[in-house]
């Protein structure tokens, strides 16, 4: 059976191959000097890490005491450690309250894997013996409700829907009322992801938060943004907009197995001080993994 680390390494191969081969080329029979450091800097920026993160890494890299003869594996080891340091704020666990309803507001643009991620989380917590409900608040997209229904059936969870085009906030409110009545442990709220009209969407999300606070002033327990690793630099804009609307508590990064831009995750964590709760490295339920910065950093450089 393939280990979690091996699966992660395999999933990050599109990014890591670029970085690993680039390092091999830069440091083939060359010493560490200004020229090779500049080439390394360019390579890391090309992997979608932000300029500020790469600058930090290079500055720290200069302080590392290397032997005169340096090989690419030594560079990769040092680089992995420095990337791990940049991710120091990323490993806050996704904690849940005991004996109380946990309301998880899940945001993300259409196509990011939001609905699928909710289905996987519902199944995962259902297998742990939790009572799970899902509120279908993307009421203007019938396909979203159908997709959610398939996942919720698999997870043996409760699906709470509204009429087509119903006010999403009213569906969220009713779902929360129903969850309290039925002693549900976790309520996932699936939201719309239409970014072509940002103001309406963000107002809709803000309204959902306002409405559920009427039933519990501490709700939501978590506001999570699902981001697609393939998106690259546009991820920064997404995090900024959704954070303004919902005060995000953390991120879930999907489709790492199909992205050559996984380096963007490092920059996003640094800029917004948000943890990464889970990462998606495949289609199966068990391919949604708790984020581990040490394994991620090593896999990113091809170790």
From Swiss-Prot:
Its EC number is 3.6.5.4. GO terms for cellular component: cytoplasm; plasma membrane. Gene3D superfamilies: P-loop containing nucleotide triphosphate hydrolases (3.40.50.300), Signal recognition particle SRP54, nucleotide-binding domain (1.20.120.140). One of its GO terms (molecular function) is GTPase activity. It is found in: Cell inner membrane; Cytoplasm. SMART domains: AAA, SRP54, SRP54_N. CDD domains: FtsY. GTP binds at residues 108-115, 190-194, 254-257. It catalyses: GTP + H2O = GDP + phosphate + H(+). The keyword Mitochondrion does not apply. The keyword Membrane applies. Keywords: Cell inner membrane, Cell membrane, Cytoplasm, GTP-binding, Hydrolase, Membrane, Nucleotide-binding, Receptor. It is a peripheral membrane protein. Belongs to the GTP-binding SRP family. FtsY subfamily. This is Signal recognition particle receptor FtsY. It comes from Rickettsia felis (strain ATCC VR-1525 / URRWXCal2) (Rickettsia azadi). The gene is ftsY.
């Amino acid at each position: 059976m393939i280990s979690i680390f091996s699966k992660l390494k395999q999933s990050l191969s599109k990014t890591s191959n670029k970085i690993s081969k680039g390092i091999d080329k830069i440091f083939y029979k060359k010493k560490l000097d200004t020229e090779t450091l500049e080439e390394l800097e360019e390579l890391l920026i090309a992997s979608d890490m932000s300029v500020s993160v790469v600058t930090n890494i290079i500055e720290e890299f200069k302080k590392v005491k290397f032997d005169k003869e340096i090989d690419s594996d030594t560079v990769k080891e040092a680089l992995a450690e420095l990337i791990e340091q940049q991710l120091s704020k990323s490993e806050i666990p996704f904690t849940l309250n005991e004996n109380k309803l946990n309301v998880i507001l899940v945001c993300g643009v259409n196509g990011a894997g939001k609905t699928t991620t909710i289905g996987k989380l519902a199944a995962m917590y259902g297998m742990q013996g939790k009572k799970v409900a899902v509120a279908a608040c993307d009421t203007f997209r019938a396909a979203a409700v159908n997709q959610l229904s398939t996942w919720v059936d698999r997870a043996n969870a409760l699906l709470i829907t509204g009429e087509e085009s119903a006010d999403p906030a009213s569906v969220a409110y009713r779902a929360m009322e129903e969850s309290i009545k039925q002693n549900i442990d976790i309520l996932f709220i699936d939201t719309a992801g239409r970014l072509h009209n940002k103001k309406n969407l963000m107002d809709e999300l803000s309204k959902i938060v306002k409405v559920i606070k009427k039933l519990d002033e501490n709700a939501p327990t978590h506001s999570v943004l699902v981001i697609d690793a393939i998106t690259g630099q546009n991820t920064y804009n997404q995090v900024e907009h959704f954070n303004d609307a919902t005060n995000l508590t953390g991120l879930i990064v999907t489709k790492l197995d199909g992205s050559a831009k996984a380096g963007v995750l490092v920059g996003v964590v640094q800029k917004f001080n948000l943890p990464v709760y889970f990462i998606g490295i495949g289609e199966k339920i068990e391919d949604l993994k708790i984020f581990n910065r040490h394994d991620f950093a090593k896999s990113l450089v091809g170790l």
